[in-house]
UniProtKB/Swiss-Prot annotation:
Pathway: Quinol/quinone metabolism; 1,4-dihydroxy-2-naphthoate biosynthesis; 1,4-dihydroxy-2-naphthoate from chorismate: step 2/7; Quinol/quinone metabolism; menaquinone biosynthesis. Binds 1 thiamine pyrophosphate per subunit. Homodimer. This is 2-succinyl-5-enolpyruvyl-6-hydroxy-3-cyclohexene-1-carboxylate synthase. It comes from the Bacteria. Its cofactor is Mg(2+); Mn(2+); thiamine diphosphate. It comes from Chlorobaculum tepidum (strain ATCC 49652 / DSM 12025 / NBRC 103806 / TLS). HAMAP family: MenD. InterPro entries: DHS-like_NAD/FAD-binding_dom, MenaQ_synth_MenD, MenD_middle, THDP-binding, Thiamin_PyroP_enz_TPP-bd_dom, TPP_enzyme_TPP-bd.
Length: 582
């Protein structure tokens, strides 16, 4: 076979094996050096792919797809800075244990570090943020195709093994890059006959169950049985089953459950929004848990960590399914590397339900105060009322993606827990960046196969503006709600706001760009409701149309700060005197 035929077969084998390993969705950015890979994907009828003019957007789209499916999307790009544009998404995927596969085309050996065009050091470009990084040889009959297949299988396994994360395969190609049908009778291809006929992967792998050890469960059951004021914290979870199991355990034992938005259970009607209570210092001093079991990873708000720093529990236990360190305050006394669902199941019946610690009247009163101060239909729609209305209307068959900074905090704090079934919610909280949010939400929606609402701030929106090109299609529509306070409002809540006269200039970065013009540029419908009543009606209708829509909610940073402070001032007395026995 000539070089064209060898390269064509080489890439066809890679793509086919990825599909057989259930990594059959490809995010491709056009380029010359990646021609063999791109055409191998396009030529395989089982491959699903989407083209992306921007590699950075493609990387975040793949991240969102992984969040929805638990499987890696495959990124394909040409050589040079193309692969470097994946870096932010790779970092987020690594930090939050999301699978991802990067296939970067590269120049051959003789074109590296000699001044040749579009050639950089691509091998191991992502450093410590990959689970595995490997450079394949240039296509050639000296390399057995069996070794190519087993390498692809190992890449998928490393991406999915705990902790899941990105894997990078760098693939050098020599010109000519155009395809040519290979000779199936060539001796080099002969060992593939059985594999081709089977339709099965070259090799399989079994994922570990990550059951807790009997000894650790005995210890944990004893701690809970002896605890006087236990507390469960549900942080970010890798799947819905974990969150539901933890919620069921908390209910059966009567243990208060601080459920973060990333846990997947915060919006459930069975969930108590302890975030509101933990804002109040008097409540925190009175509550003082002695045993805390933290299921999963990060939480959005600072309230629980600050409370536990002031009143350290006797035992702080972390339950996670992978060995990554999670001890940001260096106060963890026991770590269980196991599935949260498995641990929750093993703890059932370890004690009688905890008496008291309910505060039902307080939470009912707090809910009424929030609705009265922020959500009356005639009032202007705000950064507090918008997430509360969204959480109350988005139901089964719909999903929610929330951007970082204030949208995440306000949804976590003020969302209405009314969903009859846990609403699928996702955030990029691995490193909590504001970049690539629209792209991630679009990938999340595509992976779920569900229409999705994105709640996002104006700076995050502008940061990923070109991703709006992903929305003008009829499938998996995205409702984008832009909370436009003309800058970074979160800085108004930070100590720096009172310590400098350069808040706007150096931190808030005021902007006056037109959200409406951006929507028009990308052919997306646009609306700008003024009141809560208008927004409620508009959003309820949007949920039924199955069409992408950008809703701009205009806000003033000073008024937003005042509303947050006024609301907290009204809520504080409720929890200062809360009767936790009811």
């Amino acid at each position: 076979m000539n070089s064209k035929q060898i390269t064509t077969l080489w890439c066809a084998v890679i793509v086919e094996e990825l599909i057989r390993q259930e990594a059959g969705f490809f995010c491709i950015s056009p380029g010359s050096r990646s021609t063999p890979l791109t055409l191998a994907v396009a030529s395989n009828p089982k491959a699903r792919f989407r083209m992306f003019p921007d590699e950075r957007s493609a990387g975040f789209y793949a991240l969102g797809y992984a969040r929805a499916t638990g499987m890696p999307a495959v990124l394909v790009c040409t050589s040079g800075t193309a692969v470097a544009n994946y870096f932010p998404a790779v970092v987020e995927a690594s930090a939050d244990a999301q699978p991802m596969l990067v296939l970067s085309a590269d120049r051959p050996f003789e074109l590296l570090e000699c001044g040749a065009n579009q050639a950089i050091r691509q091998q191991n470009i992502f450093g410590s943020y990959t689970r595995w990084s490997f450079e394949l040889p240039e296509p050639g009959i000296a390399t057995p195709l069996a070794s190519l297949l087993s390498t692809v299988d190992h890449a998928v396994r490393k991406s999915l093994s705990l902790p899941a994360g990105p894997v990078h395969l760098n693939l050098p190609f020599r010109e000519p890059l155009e395809p040519e049908a290979p000779d199936p009778g060539h001796p080099w291809a002969a060992p593939l006959e059985t594999w081709q006929a089977s339709g099965e992967p070259w090799s399989r792998f079994a994922r570990p169950l990550h059951e807790p050890s009997a000894e650790s469960i005995v210890t944990l059951r004893e701690l809970l049985a002896q605890a006087e004021r236990p507390l469960f914290v549900a942080g970010s979870m890798s799947n819905a089953a974990d969150g539901e199991a933890v919620a069921a355990l908390a209910e059966s034992l009567g243990v208060p459950l601080f459920a973060d938005l990333t846990s997947g259970i915060r919006l459930s009607s069975d969930c108590t929004p302890w975030q509101l209570a933990f804002q109040n210092e008097a409540f925190v001093e009175r509550f003082q848990p002695d045993v805390v079991i933290h299921f999963g990873g990060h939480v959005i708000g600072k309230q629980p960590a600050m409370a536990l720093r002031k009143q350290p529990p006797l035992h702080y236990v972390v339950v996670r399914e992978h060995p990554g360190r999670f001890d940001p305050d260096h106060n963890v006394t026991l770590t269980l590397e196991a599935s949260p669902a498995a641990v929750a199941s093993a703890l059932e019946g370890c004690r009688e339900p905890v008496p008291g610690i309910r505060c039902r009247d307080a939470f009912s009163a707090a809910s009424g105060i929030i609705d009265k101060m922020a959500c009356v239909p005639e009032l202007a729609v705000s950064e507090i009322s918008a997430p509360r209305i969204v959480s109350s209307l988005a139901g089964d068959g719909h999903a929610l993606f929330v951007a970082n900074s204030m949208p995440a905090r306000d949804m976590d704090l003020y969302a209405a827990p009314v969903a009859q079934k846990p609403l699928q919610v996702a955030l990029n909280r691995g490193v909590s960046g504001i970049d690539g949010i629209i792209s991630t939400a679009a990938g999340f929606s595509a992976g779920l196969g569900k229409p999705t609402t994105l709640l996002i701030g104006d700076i995050s929106f502008l940061h990923d503006l070109n991703a709006l090109c992903l929305l003008n299609h009829p499938w998996n529509p995205l409702i984008v709600i832009v909370l436009n306070n003309h800058g970074g409002s979160i800085f108004s809540f930070l100590p720096i706001a009172s310590q400098t006269d350069r808040l706007d200039e150096c931190f808030a970065t005021p902007q006056n760009f037109s959200i409406e013009s951006a929507a028009r540029t990308f052919g997306i419908d646009y609306a700008c409701p003024e009141t809560n009543g208008d927004f409620t009606q508009l959003y309820a209708e949007a949920l039924t149309t199955k069409k992408s829509l950008i809703i701009e909610i205009r806000s003033d940073r000073e008024k937003n700060l005042l509303l947050h402070r006024s609301l907290k001032a009204r809520l504080d007395p409720v929890f200062e005197k809360a009767d936790c026995s009811r």
